[in-house]
């Protein structure tokens, strides 16, 4: 093995550190577990002979150092989305690096490609929202008419969420307003179709529920990472509260204006 690979120069070590941090950031911001991010970064550091590498990952940040702390980096990861295609691409790259079949230049190119993997197209997300909400309405005991109302609400709110994402609106506002929009559309749709609105509302709200955040929080707790688990659980609870606020506002206003309790 080349001694330059075993003992990289200072410039090379900084380049390796930048690559590893970018890989960890890509994993974290696209929905990977905290434990997996740390593990992947450590594997890459060992393979590229970045000695005395230490990393600490939270749900919204990465802290890492190498050597006797002469190389240290901090990355803030405020935005967390879910793109398992990117996570899978980085994991595949990590396995190939561990097997010794990828150079640093190749790894950097592969990582750049992984970070450019696009999200599903808007039309796909609209269709997924429409079909998913209809199925949830049926699962929760709704009728075909309830499912149709839920499908319409799912289509509209999926488009609304895409618009909010483009405008970079805050997550809290997005969830409250989306929940309110869902409730309003379901009430109107079910009124037109002469069916109860509760199953349609519940089925459509499922696309807003923080299932991933809640599950990841529990997994972090189980793995002993209590700080990251607490952050994820609080995030999930805040999203749930936002959904409840948006839904409750519309239901209360509807009851106040019409004198009829929506069921």
Question: Could you say what each language-model-derived stretch is?
Answer:
Residues 79-146, 235-244:
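Alpha-helical transmembrane segments and their cytosolic membrane-interface
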Residues 35, 106-120, 172-173, 198-203:
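Cytosolic regulatory modules rich in charged/polar residues
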């Amino acid at each position: 093995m080349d001694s330059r690979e075993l003992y990289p120069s200072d410039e090379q070590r900084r380049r390796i550190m930048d690559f590893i941090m970018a890989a960890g950031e890509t994993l974290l911001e696209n929905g990977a577990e905290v434990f997996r991010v740390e593990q992947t970064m450590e594997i890459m550091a060992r393979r590229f002979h970045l000695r005395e590498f230490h990393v600490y990952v939270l749900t919204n940040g990465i802290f890492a150092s190498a050597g006797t702390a002469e190389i240290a980096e901090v990355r803030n990861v405020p935005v967390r989305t879910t793109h398992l295609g990117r996570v899978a691409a980085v994991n595949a790259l990590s396995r190939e690096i561990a097997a010794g079949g990828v150079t640093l230049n190749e790894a950097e190119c592969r990582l750049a490609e992984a970070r450019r993997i696009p999200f599903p197209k808007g039309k796909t997300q609209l269709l997924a929202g429409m079909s998913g909400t209809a199925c949830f309405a049926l699962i929760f005991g709704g009728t075909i008419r309830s499912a149709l109302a839920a499908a319409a609400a799912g289509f509209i709110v999926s488009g609304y969420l895409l618009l909010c994402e483009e405008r970079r609106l805050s997550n809290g506002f997005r969830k409250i307003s989306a929940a309110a929009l869902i409730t309003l559309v379901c009430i109107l749709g079910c009124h037109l179709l002469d069916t109860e609105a509760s199953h349609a509302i519940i089925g459509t709200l499922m696309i807003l529920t923080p299932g991933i955040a809640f599950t990841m929080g529990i997994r972090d707790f189980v793995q002993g990472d209590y700080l990251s688990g607490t952050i994820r659980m609080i995030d999930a609870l805040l999203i749930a509260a936002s959904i409840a606020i948006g839904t409750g506002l519309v239901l209360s206003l509807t009851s106040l204006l019409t004198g009829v309790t929506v069921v």
